[in-house]
Amino acid sequence: MILKYSLLGNLLLLWINIVNSVVMVGLYYGFLTTFSIGPSYLLLLRTRVMKEGSEKEVSATTAFIMGQFIVFISTYYPPLHLALSRPHTLTVLVIPYLLSHFWFFWNNKKSLFDYRSTHGNFIPNLSIQYVFLNNLIFQLFNHFVLPSSTLTRLVDISMFRYNNKILFVTSSFFGWLIGHMLLMKCIGLVLSWPWEKMRSNALFRSNKYLMSKWRNSVSQIFSILLFIICICYLGRMPSPIITKKLKESSKREEKKKTEEEGNVEIERVSKTNKIKQEEDGSVEEDLSISLEMEERWNLYKKIYETEEIWLNGKEKDEFDLKEKEKNKLLGIEKSLLSLLFDYQRWNRPLRYIENDRFSNAVRNEMSQSFFYTCASDGKQRISFTYPPSLSTFFEMIKKKMSFRTAEKLPAEDLSNEWVSTTKKQRDNLRNEFINRIEAIDKGSLILNVVEKRARLCNDEEEQECLPKFYDPLLNGPYRGTRKKGYLYSIRNDSTTSTRGSTKTAWINKIHAILFSKDYREFEREFEHEMYKLGVKSSSTGIEDSSVSIGEFTEEAEEAEKSRTRFKQFAFGGEEKVFEKVFDMVRADPNDQKISNLPIEEIKKKVPRWLYKLTSDLDFEEEEEEEEEDDQEESTDDHGIRSRKGKRVVIYTDTNQGTNIINTTNNIIKTHDNIIKTTNDNIIKTTTDNIINTNDNIIKTTDNIINTNDNIIKTTDNIINTNDNIIKTTDSNREKNSDDKVENGDQAEENEMALIRYSQQSDFRRDLIKGSMRAQRRKTVTWEMFQTDAHSPLFFDRIDKTPLFSFDISRMMNLIFRNWMEEKSPKMKTSSYVGEGAKEKEKIEEEHEEEKGEYKRKEDKRQEEERIAIAETWDNIIFAQAIRGSILVTHSILRKYIVLPSLIIVKNIGRMLLFQFPEWYEDFNEWSREMHVKCTYNGVQLSETEFPKDWLTDGIQIKILFPFSLKPWHRSKLRSHHKDLRKKQKNFCFLTIWGMETELPFGSPRKKPFFFEPIHKAFEKKIIKVKKKGFFFLIIIKDNIKGFIKILNEKIRWIIKIVLFIKIKVKEVFFFFVLRRVSDPSQNEEPSKNEKDSKISNRIIHESPIRIVSRDWTNDSLIEIKINDLADKTTKIWDQVEKIRKDKKKKPLTPDIEDIDISTNKGNCSNKRTESRKHIWQISKKRRSARLISKWDSFMKSFIERIYMSILLCITNIYRIYVQFFLDSTKKTLNGYTYNDEIKEKDTNEPNPNIIPFISTVKSLSTYTTNISSDSNSPIYCDLSSLSQAYVFYKLLQTQVSNKYKSESIFHYYRTYPFIKDGIKDYFHDYFHTRGIFDSESKHKKLRNSGMSEWKNWLKSHYQYNLSHDKWSRLAPLKWRKKVNQHRTIQNNDSPKSGSYEEKDQLIHSGKKDYSKLGLLKSPSREMKSPSREKKIKKHYRYDLLSYKYLNYEDVKDSNIYGSPLQVNRHGEISNYNTHKYKSFYAITINDSLEDKYTIDRDQNLDRKYFELRITNFDPRNNIETRTSTDIGTFINKKKKTTKTGTNKKDILSLYIRIHQEIQTKQKEFFFDWMGMNEQMLDRTISNLRPWFLPEFVPLYDRYTTNPWIIPINLILFDFHGNKTSDLYIDPKVESNQKERFHPKPKVESNQKGYLELENRNRDEKERQHQGNLISDIRNKKKDVGANSAGSDIKKRRKKKKFKSKKEAELDLFLKKYFIFQLRWDDPFNKGMNNNIKVYCLLLRLMNPNEIAISSIQSGEMGLDVMLINRGFSLPELIKKGIFLIEPVRLSIKRDGISIMYQTIAISLTHKIQHQTNQGYQLKKYIDKNYFNGSIARHGGVRVNGDNNNYDLLVPEHILSPSHRRELRILSRFNYRNRNLVNKNPVFCNRAKTNAQGFEKFVNRDKHFHTDTNNSLKWKVFLWPTHRLEDLACMNRYWFDTNNGSRFSMSRIHMYQQFGIRGCYSQFPSLSRAWYMRTCK
């Protein structure tokens, strides 16, 4: 047996080795490659189908196999692979070959296809070589048709798995060859069938013409198929010839920009000099400086324009010739390159990202994934987020300076060196850290121990430092962009220069190194240049060369000035290869004289696209702007596709100097006059008419507005359009004024236009023209008018409505309702009359709702039909011209031919009928009819003015006061009887059939019939005739009554006689029947049986069988049978009666005996069985009859019961939810009573009133008790043993639990330590019993856990905890103009969101309160769809498993180091009870977030924004803190009491807090940003999220008390001035500045302060009183806001221009934080749109009174929309709800700047550090990072400032931030021991540490982790590589596939918990830190 098993095992092993061998795998993949069929197979099949001869078949097969062999070889041979794989090279080769191939084929058919067979194999035949070449080349093209190219790529992918690549390629080729032979064999069998059929046909054999024709047709079919396939594939390739030539930004534009910058710079310098003159009085020196600056700028501009470099000893002409030759060569080379392929064009279908602050778009190079090697942990690793520009730079350096590079050391040596270096650094930092702790333990002062950072001090005595923004010794987020300053430099007195000064010469070497072909040649030229300049250069190139220069010649000075903006670079690091590459040359500092020279700004040039693109719709506006700027420029190049839209001119102003505002004012005045003149006729007499007109605006304008364009649809678009119109008219007005001055009375036209968009779906918009459409994101469209694009991957998930769909629930409802309606009339005796009436009313209401719904659907359907018709006309070529011509023709025919002819015919007919003619009335009405020309959307123009380009854009003709022919006219005296409420639409539109329709493209309406009034008149006449004959009819009726009475008596007598005869006949009939029924045997015993018959046959039922009259003498057989049947029937009825009687006495049983079967005989035993059978048949018939009779009532009752049960279920469901909601609300309110006993009871015992939503896990209590019994032992879970496959498997199986206790994990996006102990135990047991965690390895040491302590910190904090100021610094890019929707979580983390009464309650509240608050997250109104909920649950499941997979550690006695399911039973939550002081960044981002979507704070939708300075805001007066606006705690700081209740008046609190003068005794403190210096009390966590209605809880708690805007004078200073001072306008200031006054809104209290704009002069005075804290550099930026971007405003070319930088920065600030808009309801929008249409017509009329009155009467123009009262103040507009002031909700976008800033911590020293204010927090500048609000949200409880040991909360903060980060990083790496846990003894194993001072410091208290003042927090933040990769695999929501092909990382959730410090690290000597820039 053993031998057999061993042999079997060997055979199995041998088989496995054979299968896994290179040869077998190659054969397998090669065989799969056969099924990738390309167009080359068509050529091969053509030779076989056409039977052209064996030579061609052999040549085609040989070429095909050879081409495939070359393709296989190319996978191994790189040069061949590059030649065949590069698309551009292949395209260049393919296009000429295809053209020649098809041209040669079509022109040489006869010579090419020679069907005569050749007898010799070696006779030269061109067709054979041609076939060979075709098959060979087409096989190399390597494009595939079926199924795809994936099977072919498998060979390339699998080849890298094996070392023996040649063997793999060879075997794969043979595998393909085998598959190819089999495939050809099968195809040959199929193709042989048609040839056999043709050979069997005698006609084909005899007729050679048919054979040749068939061959030609087959050849053409193959060629056409091949041509189509090739064209399709060419569309997928970048064509180098047919490309969109984009316009390059010209040098003249750049020159103009530099001139503008220079002019702005000179103006700024002159303004600064004026200020200095006023202060210092140094007039002469400053004037000379300004003149000198202007001269220098002119010289710089001259040098920039010429761009000539000429040195000493060389003439200018020589350099000119050389430069021209170089430019010619470069131009030729560039033209050749761009002719074939422009590498700077948009090849991929990317969106054009445009920034308003710059001219061209920024190239977002970091968004795409890029692979490059970099040093990590001392080893070369592949980084997939490496910057492409940096890799290109290193490649250039390597090529140019390869001789200077150091020798490459082995990887092991590099790793050893890195390990040793990092160990030394770690030890040094550790020793320094321990020494500082020991110094603290010995009693040293904190200031002497804390590591300090140098600051640049402005005043040494007062210790005033420069602002962080300008401090050169600081780096990080406080370092902004500095503008060009002026520094005093050294000048040589002996220099006799006309310009009076010299500059320091900086000669850059790196520029020539990178862009020269030979470095040695550059060295020689450089030395020669230095010699010409008289400079002694250093020979080493490593050290700086600072050599004296005696005197500069004038040529040398010019040469120095000609060098443009060289920058100084320095490469830092351990390798000194590129260190100090630049040799600097300085002037001689012997003779010193002060002069003002500009400092070159060191910038990083942002990579931008070369082209500046414009969209099609922006062309008009930009064209006008360019005409203003430069008449020579023209931007005919539209590089961006925009939505299909047409510009429609609606008004043209030809008058000189008029504008749209004056015109509209005249219209409004005209309307005022109209209203005044028509008050008596309209307002008084037709009040109801006007009210109904206004009420029915929606009905009359629904269909009109739907055909309008998108801009007229929405109010925002209307506002935007109006803004553009005002801009256009303003620009034209300025042009007109200029032309009037210059050219006299030269009139120009001002056009007012709208843009009409197409309703058809267009997914090409915003794409760049010329980009490769095949590589764009794939979309699926299945409808003609589709609103959204869908990916093919998710197409199956879309709910597509089938063709035949039935609403089952609706049908059931109708059926049940019908049953109930049938039943309701029968329930007349019911006592519930009231309920029946209610039910009837309810049914009627439902019926009305259904009718309304049907009407809405019908209107929507008609609207869609109109849109489809309009789009069809718009898309068909020349359709608009044809339609417009037809409409104009019909209009002319109707107006001047048809209607006058009808009038003439009518009046002639009246005269023939002897009626008076109505010529005047008819022609008067005919003259009132107006045919107004309208745009395609219905915007009215005039009768004579046609729309611009109406033949191409379309036209509508609107008929006002349409004429209808009437047989006669009523007199005007009877008009008052007319019902005024019946409004008649006195307008219509003309159709192409000459008919009238109410809406464009609508259905024709019914016209009044001409003879209808005549018909009505005849009916009235008939009625009159009937009335006259009424009396005659009454007389006749009275006379007829007597006759009728006599007739009735006679009829009654006849009826009585007939009845008597009928009775007699019945008696005779019954006598014969009874006699025949009796039995003949009865005659024998008459006495006895007579008695029995009387008893048994009392009731003789009629027989159902018809009895025919019979002959008494002759009895036939049929008559006998009839008699027998009658006898049996009577017997059956007797038996039924007897059974009924017996049943009453006793129940019927199957053993019934002795029943009389016959009426004549008694008990007959021979008939006993028969009697039983008859009895059961009778009973069976009886039951069926009973069922049949009661079936109807049974079904009704059954259906009633079902219907009632359904209703009961529905009501129960509602009751459950309502009860659940009430219980949750009750618990929420009870949560603030601070009763620990109730909380404990609620925690440990389930609530019986709450209905559980999932089944309870079996024996949950036993598991809980078992675990709780062993509560002292820590619980761990090893998640590192999970494999990737197991993770995905569990992702599929993991279901989101709905149990109310576990909802806080899945639905409440919060941290794990707030989960109750019972929940943790439950999940721990649940997951262990389900086998998710490996219980065997839970106590083992974890691999790689030594460097992953940071993960425990991550899981213990909420990941969006960022300050508002922090987020405001991120500044997302301006080009994101769309709403960026993110699912955000309601804020529960604000420092002021909760309070505590006592410190001891902090732990309990943190452990228990969150189980009741926000457990079940109800989706908002935007998220109610099941698919949305499903997606949210999926994301929660991903996040939950991701956290479980990331966060694991084996650390004792620390909740943050424990398992995510571990229960901390002793309440030792060290990381959460530690009080953290609030810093400048402590306000969380979550205060502005909600369960809704956030919008981009940088979007600019052309809305009007609020001015910053009108807000009267002082955050120091924040006395009362409202923690919630609906239900929450109300805190009074004076009394320190907490109230619980509902603050209803806070629900609609103002968005801007008006200053309240409340007299309080507050001590002075520094500037309180957002209320950070306010006193924090012990308060509970205010987490007021109802379970079902979260949208009713506003999340503007902090904003209502402290808005996110502050006065400008408080942003940059610590303000010590008057706290209650308001910002106002001084009436005594200069009046030349523009000021805007805003009236006071009506707010709470009787305040009389107004929201006014502060004056800039007052602002400057207030700043002067505060003290001059900064130098002149600071004074130049007085009014810059806190979020100043620092970018140059003049770069915003063709954009919104500001008068000053202050306005630009203010505009940027307002766009970030505020959005101010007009909110109009939908009916208001429609009414406004209708009014606009009427206004367009009234503008063109000389006397618009009649049209205006008729428009008002018909409801086409509404008075309530006109806002005639133009004196509305701001409070009234706010009160009406028209004007809204709202904060823009901050989005959670991040960019590269934020990632860099989050890695840097700033340490500041300030004198206020030593101050202590009682009752307030201390202001600290040691490190603002750790004073964050993430812990304060759990209860920042410091009230008393006596305790000064807050500096020791984190001992590592003794070090500087840079050393602190370095210490953390170095301590987390396990250099050699990767498999074991080797923790840092200082941090993790305090018992073994050698530092006694640290031991004493840590072990002062047993409850160290729970002590607020002594808590130690270890904060690690490094992302390891493997965890990021796992995260990418597990949660695809965090990643994105960009542009359809590449994989780029986006939306990485940043775990930002401690202020500026985040999850990334910037450490120069380590490259493990990841820098990621989110692309979206």
UniProtKB/Swiss-Prot annotation:
Bilayer topology annotation: Multi-pass membrane protein
Coiled-coil portions: none
Annotated TM spans: 11-31, 64-84, 87-107, 126-146, 173-193, 221-241, 1054-1074, 1202-1222
Domain of life, source organism: Eukaryota
One annotated GO biological process: protein transport
Region named Disordered: 619-642, 830-861, 1633-1669
InterPro entries with a match to the protein in the record: TIC214
Compartments where found: Plastid, Chloroplast inner membrane
Acidic residues: compositionally biased ranges: 619-635
GO cellular component terms attached to this protein's record: chloroplast inner membrane
Keywords annotated in UniProt: Chloroplast, Membrane, Plastid, Plastid inner membrane, Protein transport, Transmembrane, Transmembrane helix, Transport
Biased composition annotated in UniProt, kind: Basic and acidic residues: 836-861, 1633-1665
UniProt function note: Involved in protein precursor import into chloroplasts. May be part of an intermediate translocation complex acting as a protein-conducting channel at the inner envelope.
Alphabetized PANTHER family for the sequence: PROTEIN TIC 214 (PTHR33163:SF40), PROTEIN TIC 214-RELATED (PTHR33163)
Quaternary structure and interacting proteins, as annotated: Part of the Tic complex.
Family: Belongs to the TIC214 family.
Listed name of the protein: Protein TIC 214
